Amino acid sequence: FSSRLNMNLREDKHWAYGAYSFTSGALGQRPWMAFAPVQIDKTAESLRELDREIRQYASGQVPPSGEEVARIQATEIRSLPGAYETGRAVMGTVGGMVRYDRPDDYVFERKARIEALDVDQVKRAAATIDPDKLVWVVVGDLKQTEAAVRALDLGEVRIVDADGQPVTSPASM
């Protein structure tokens, strides 16, 4: 709730109910995603803010603070018991250990690994994000958002229908 993205778009600007980013578990390259369901009339402005925040963070211009890292550590540590509250949660934890070839004592080491995370490690991880290679996905009323989103010049704009099929004539939507 206290992430930079959420504080900016929800708390400061009041354009979103919530905004956050996360990595998804995967073998090899892991996708990193940011979500921000926003007011439709603030779509372009919100994209501009997301782009600015991401660029400043990744470049080190506005690096992670010790307070931010400590807050994330505390949140992660408090969530650890939830991995064992139900049979399904235990299976998910064990499945992740197998999938990612984690050691048998992974669950016992996890807290210590989280506590050992430091600001420099987070800075190095942030530096691996290349804002110029991001794929931006905008969902909403094309008539209300297209011109302003195109004006941001975040890259090639591709329009797809609800089934993910390319749309050749946006006027027909």
Placement of each model-derived feature along the sequence:
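Proteolytic maturation boundary segments
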Residues: V119-M173
